[in-house]
Amino acid sequence: MKKVYLTLIALLAVISASAQGWPANYNGVMLQGFSWNAYEAAQWKALEAQTTEFKGFIDLVWVPQSGKCAEPVQVMGYKPYYYFNHNSSFGTEDELRSMIKTFKNNGIGTIADVVINHHNTEGWFTFPAETYKGVTYQMKSTDICKNDDGGKTATQAQKEGVSLSNNNDEGEDFGDCRDLDHNSANVQKVVKAYLKFLKEDLGYEGFRYDMVKGFNASHVGDYNTATGIQYSVGEYWDGVGNIKNWINNTGKKSGAFDFPFHYNMTNAIRYNDWRKLYDACLMSDPSYRQYAITFVENHDIQVREDNSNEGNKDPIPTAYIPAANAFMIAMPGTPCIFQPHWKAYEHELKSMIEARKLAGITNTSSYNNYANNKQYFANAVNGTNGRKLLVVVGIPSMMTTPSKTEYTRILSGKNYMYYLSNNSETAWADKASGTYEEGFETTLTAVSKNSNAKLVYTTNGNDPTASSTQATSGTSINISSSCTLKVGLLINGTVSGIRTYNYSIKRFEPYNITVYVNTDAVNWKKVNFYYWGNIDKPDWPGTPITQTKMIDGKNWYYKDFTITQKGGMLNFVFCEPNDAGTKEKSQSVDITGINSTVFIKVGPEKDGGKYVVTNVTKEVNTGIDQPITENTGKNVNNAWYTLSGMKMNQKPNQAGIYIHHGKKVVIK
């Protein structure tokens, strides 16, 4: 009995530790992997393709709500409908699983956007029934708050003879959906099953809870304890005192976004007074900075093309985006970088993150104000092993330069500078590892107490030695091709503090793809392609397609497209137009994230009145593996085919890729 008791105690301790809200001494950096209505950039395939660039810099990626919604058009997911079906506007469930798995294999966790304050319905009161692992889960009308939608729901319920919960909403109301009563045993059962599915089945490692002002914080604590989730952050949009109260009421089982940190930054910029960074925020309190997820901009505050957030809009002016991020990344708390900022300043942000990690800064690090006035603000942040990172924002040139015996400048940009304490004893290059589209210069710096320290470096991946190429601190070297740069300190004939930088130089070249569509199952007599993304979209119902090819005994409508930019993707709807070509008779669901040649079959099943499609590219190319190279000098008599499946009369003489013996063959 005693053994069983001790086992239970140990199990409870493990659960408690894993539901601590946010780990202490955490040195990771998070990326918000989306912005408002930017569907192409947030496709699961697009995010997964960036894994190599994220690795070593980004530790967590917060992605959009991944469950399938009821709307027949692309949506951001904030009106959830299905909990266990994760085919969404951002890709298929298979693509989602692949992304999460790839991230995890590279040391990157995925944060789910969890929207449980409210739920969409068919009509006023019908929730979907979903079966998972043999158990059917479904919300009932009695799970809807009694005063939902300002009493409109109760009025409708009376008309339809439907019962609601006896409990009023615990917080703010969301008018477009039904607000859930989290005191309902059924709601708790469904939500806990959903969250366990996200963590244990899909592989999410953390939750971002949307609109937590809508229900009591205690429920977040309960859900996190039941799930054993490691990372939890709530969107409690309020002042610092109320955010702290919310964290306390979760049982300190969740972190929270540091909205005051954001407003301190925008106020400093707006009023041209950098002393406003002194103002209190979650990160500034040593007792709460563990739970502070800092950010400078997000999808609710950014400028939206549709102006749907007019009252909340508070973006960072473009000229100050690097500086705002530099301050955030240097400070304690867990920084969360906004995707548009990452896309625009990736290499610069990587160098900031490298400096943070080199100094050993975590979410619980301490700091001191170094200098300040209206024109500039500087904090010295304490890392590990006595190292410090000094961040200066505003007009850094107006500040007295720190003592060269204490600090060395390692990074500078528009409206910011980074200095690293000399006891770090390390070499440094100011261009971070990653992929670049053209050659560049990187400046090498010796950070050392020894003023006579020099630098040695190699570009072949070997550790530098005392006999390697030497450079003085501040020397810029040219990187013109892909290489591995290793640079170290040289002091009294000994090399130490080696840093490694992996540079890949790949200029993007536009390339062509072909989209093939087969409509045999739906008997369409005409086919239009409607497309959008990194391309001029046609008027609805799209471009008439007249080109066809017979491949594998089937007729395929096809059109060629050009991918014109790095990470570019196209999206499609296929439809049968009316005789006049002015509207559709019937159409497919949306197909998103296309960046390579695909074969797609339409129908016959429907989803929301639209035909479901299947990507059959692998089936059409059955037996076609990776290309092999064959010299044209070989004499082969068997048939040759183009990639589109057209048989050739003889072996091709023109260079290209062909199909031969069931393989892709490169003719040079």
Place the predicted regions along the sequence by residue.
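C-terminal outer-membrane/trafficking sorting elements
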Residues: 15, 622-668
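Active-site-proximal helices and loops of the catalytic beta/alpha 8
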Residues: 21-36, 46-55, 65-67, 72-79, ...
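Aromatic- and acidic-residue-enriched segments that line the glycan-binding/catalytic groove
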Residues: 72-80, 118-163, 225
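Short proline/glycine-enriched turn/loop motifs at strand-loop junctions of beta-rich domains
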Residues: 332, 394-397, 446-454, 521-527, ...
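Short, compositionally stereotyped local motifs that mark structural "simplifiers"
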Residues: 423-509
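Aromatic-rich carbohydrate-binding modules that target alpha-glucans
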Residues: 463-474, 521-565, 577-589
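Surface-exposed, short loops/turns at beta-strand junctions within beta-sandwich domains
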Residues: 476-484, 563-568, 651-654
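Conserved structural position at the C-terminal beta-strand
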Residues: 489-491, 576, 660
